[in-house]
From Swiss-Prot:
<protein>
    <recommendedName>
        <fullName>Histone H2B.2</fullName>
    </recommendedName>
</protein>
<dbReference type="InterPro" id="IPR007125">
    <property type="entry name" value="Histone_H2A/H2B/H3"/>
</dbReference>
<feature type="cross-link" description="Glycyl lysine isopeptide (Lys-Gly) (interchain with G-Cter in SUMO); alternate">
    <location>
        <position position="7"/>
    </location>
</feature>
<comment type="subunit">
    <text>The nucleosome is a histone octamer containing two molecules each of H2A, H2B, H3 and H4 assembled in one H3-H4 heterotetramer and two H2A-H2B heterodimers. The octamer wraps approximately 147 bp of DNA.</text>
</comment>
<feature type="compositionally biased region" description="Basic and acidic residues">
    <location>
        <begin position="1"/>
        <end position="19"/>
    </location>
</feature>
<feature type="modified residue" description="N6-acetyllysine; alternate">
    <location>
        <position position="8"/>
    </location>
</feature>
<dbReference type="InterPro" id="IPR009072">
    <property type="entry name" value="Histone-fold"/>
</dbReference>
<keyword id="KW-0539">Nucleus</keyword>
<dbReference type="GO" id="GO:0005634">
    <property type="term" value="C:nucleus"/>
</dbReference>
<comment type="function">
    <text>Core component of nucleosome. Nucleosomes wrap and compact DNA into chromatin, limiting DNA accessibility to the cellular machineries which require DNA as a template. Histones thereby play a central role in transcription regulation, DNA repair, DNA replication and chromosomal stability. DNA accessibility is regulated via a complex set of post-translational modifications of histones, also called histone code, and nucleosome remodeling.</text>
</comment>
<keyword id="KW-0832">Ubl conjugation</keyword>
<keyword id="KW-0158">Chromosome</keyword>
<feature type="cross-link" description="Glycyl lysine isopeptide (Lys-Gly) (interchain with G-Cter in SUMO); alternate">
    <location>
        <position position="17"/>
    </location>
</feature>
<feature type="modified residue" description="Phosphoserine">
    <location>
        <position position="11"/>
    </location>
</feature>
<feature type="modified residue" description="N6-acetyllysine; alternate">
    <location>
        <position position="17"/>
    </location>
</feature>
<keyword id="KW-0007">Acetylation</keyword>
<keyword id="KW-1017">Isopeptide bond</keyword>
Length: 129
């Protein structure tokens, strides 16, 4: 027997082949479930229909709007998290969210966002009781 050469780093060797398991009728009939992708599409569509009932929206525009909502959500959440950390609090409250919105959105847009949020929360609270 010849002397063995130095060992090289293991490369991706194929795994040992095992005899194939027999497929049963039940495993063939199972369908793969689609992975769910959560979007704001239905909510964006509802708001669109409230404001402009006769207007539609394309898939591309809906994708852009979804990205926009995700981006704003991340910005507000990140800013609120920083504010909570500055104040040595471990919980993000409505106050941190409101302050984050005021810091992120410019001028009139922030004022309208805060007033709409306050109005909506009041409406929700009164409906829950």
């Amino acid at each position: 027997m010849a002397p063995k050469a130095e060992k090289k780093p293991a490369s991706k060797a194929p795994a040992e082949k095992k005899p194939a398991a027999k497929k049963t009728a039940s495993s063939d009939s199972k369908k793969r479930t689609k992975t769910r992708k959560e979007t704001y599409s239905s909510y964006i569509y509802k708001v669109l229909k409230q404001t402009h009932p006769d207007t539609g929206i394309s898939q591309k525009a809906m994708s852009i709007m979804n990205s926009f909502v995700n981006d704003i959500f991340e910005r507000v959440a990140s800013e609120a998290s920083k504010l909570a950390a500055y104040n040595k609090k471990s919980t993000i409250s409505a106050r941190e969210i409101q302050t984050a919105v005021r810091l992120i959105l410019p001028g009139e847009l922030a004022k309208h966002a805060v007033s709409e949020a306050t109005r909506t929360i009041t409406k929700y609270s009164s409906a829950a009781n």
